[in-house]
Amino acid sequence: MSRNKVEICGVDTSKLPVLKNEEMRKLFRQLQDEGDDSAREKLVNGNLRLVLSVIQRFNNRGEYVDDLFQVGCIGLMKSIDNFDLSHNVKFSTYAVPMIIGEIRRYLRDNNPIRVSRSLRDIAYKALQVRERLISETSKEPTAEDIAKVLEVPHEEIVFALDAIQDPVSLFEPIYNDGGDPIYVMDQISDERNTDSQWIEELALKEGMRRLNDREKMILRKRFFQGKTQMEVAEEIGISQAQVSRLEKAAIKQMNKNIHQ
């Protein structure tokens, strides 16, 4: 698959329209209240960039780009038909996991070499541990380091990571529409998660989305990268006291955003 291909399935990807949020909400109301098929078509065409962003993450699997694009469009159409405006969640946040799910099913059903569910679970747990160890030690962990944390044989970690072909960073963005990017980490399923936990996670993302750039940066460095207030202060050129004050204000504002 080529990242530079312009025409996919007869669609000129260099000229795809982009819908503004308010325009998108209006089209969804027309579709849901009036059954307007033209509104549905506009929503599909206006969100094809989502499909393009997702299929670029599967470019090393030897699949035809046209096939992946068509499968991704099926996921997009399903997300359009099932999207609920009342949840007050950005459409891209809802659609991207559905597009990824549709493509994963296609790849699973068409892959001559099936990877067992247990092996995939080990591989993705290993990726999570890898990212945590990098955050804690600032260096790349060995397969043996990861195996010790997960309490599984070293060979099993190596085999599991090889089996999923192209392990990527959990913090690699899958889609970015100018706001907060959607990361690989966001799409790794956890069977322990309930629907209520999923809704809480979406609420947290929406609450953080409304913070200013500096507040977002401080919270990411503190809680996602595990840095101390002093380390953050040195990186952005302010005092530790200022970081502490900004952090508290950001958390307070985020809590207010969530409960509005």
From Swiss-Prot:
Keywords: DNA-binding, Sigma factor, Sporulation, Transcription, Transcription regulation
GO terms of molecular function: DNA binding; sigma factor activity
Disulfide bonds: none
UniProt-annotated stretches for the region Recognizes anti-sigma-G factor Gin (csfB): 1-71
Tagged with keyword Membrane: no
Subunit structure: Interacts with anti-sigma-G factor Gin (csfB).
Protein name, as recorded: RNA polymerase sigma-G factor
Species assigned in the record: Bacillus subtilis (strain 168)
